[in-house]
Amino acid sequence: MLVAVVKELKQGEGRVACTPENVRKLTDAGHKVIVEKNAGIGSGFSNDMYEKEGAKIVTHEQAWEADLVIKVKEPHESEYQYFKKNQIIWGFLHLASSKEIVEKMQEVGVTAISGETIIKNGKAELLAPMSAIAGQRSAIMGAYYSEAQHGGQGTLVTGVHENVDIPGSTYVIFGGGVAATNAANVALGLNAKVIIIELNDDRIKYLQDMYAEKDVTVVKSTPENLAEQIKKADVFISTILIPGAKPPKLVTREMVKSMKKGSVLIDIAIDQGGTIETIRPTTISDPVYEEEGVIHYGVPNQPGAVPRTSTMALAQGNIDYILEICDKGLEQAIKDNEALSTGVNIYQGQVTNQGLASSHDLDYKEILNVIE
């Protein structure tokens, strides 16, 4: 199987889907690997480093001729022209956010494997490290954009406690998963107060025990509680994600209007559509805008801003799956590995993820029924 590592075209995206170390694992297993020129530069990997591990450096167009194309984020619309029948595209594709790319993949007969929908032992194994990074960085961005020079309230999130008692900021975090706890931990490290809004009762108990000795309040998620707590936020971070599907707009414009002027609103799951009515995708180079008096931060690829860290995390997570596909062939790998099967969103043009099908009102078939 010919495997290609392509350079990301998304603005500000410095990650690469495969490290030189992982290229060596593939070539040692007898697979041919091509790497687009400068694909790894943003993460600190030169073309020479890939060549030394057995890869051939190629052009963008040549990379897309491969049987298996390994990416970080969804293909750019300029890359749709390179799709070919039975080609496998691997990455954090977030297909629920764009019906156009799904229809193009269906038309051509592409197979799409989305890392964010791979579930192992009930957990989003590949997404978790990226969620952790996005959560931590969101807390930092909230502090940064709280400063007056960036349009914020002009507050120092840590407060001041030397001979005076000026309280720190309040972070309201919507959701209680990996991204949420990582955001909360950074906020606590900044001496901020944290309110977590979570739906699941078992998770609420877990969070209450986890933060029993911290300045954290855990609140049951209801529309009424959300509307009440968001008014307290100096920084509001939504972490709600439904793997493979678009989440509902749970944070309404009226709720945003009720927030403090100059407060900061961040949606970590904006790459899947987000839960906030007033938010739209932004970029790492132009990350914020003001609406209803609130600073909106809608960067969909936050880990791409810290590529040296995030590339190592994602590459460590995906290499075993990629090796299994290359060694066994996709169909056998799917049959042998239940977690991998959950990542197949489209198989040769057929939608095989129920959440994705529901998001775009498309026909759904279970993956094992399609390949048998």
Curated annotation (Swiss-Prot):
Keywords: NAD, Oxidoreductase. NAD(+) binds at residues 170-200. Its EC number is 1.4.1.1. Pfam families: AlaDh_PNT_C (PF01262), AlaDh_PNT_N (PF05222). One of its GO terms (molecular function) is alanine dehydrogenase activity. It catalyses: L-alanine + NAD(+) + H2O = pyruvate + NH4(+) + NADH + H(+). GO terms for biological process: L-alanine catabolic process. Pathway: Amino-acid degradation; L-alanine degradation via dehydrogenase pathway; NH(3) and pyruvate from L-alanine: step 1/1. The active site is at H94. One of its GO terms (cellular component) is plasma membrane. InterPro entries: Ala_DH, Ala_DH/PNT_CS2, AlaDH/PNT_CS1, AlaDH/PNT_N, AlaDH/PNT_NAD(H)-bd, NAD(P)-bd_dom_sf. It comes from the Bacteria. The keyword Oxidoreductase applies. It is an enzyme of class 1 (oxidoreductase). May play a role in cell wall synthesis as L-alanine is an important constituent of the peptidoglycan layer. Belongs to the AlaDH/PNT family. This is Alanine dehydrogenase 1. It comes from Staphylococcus aureus (strain MSSA476).
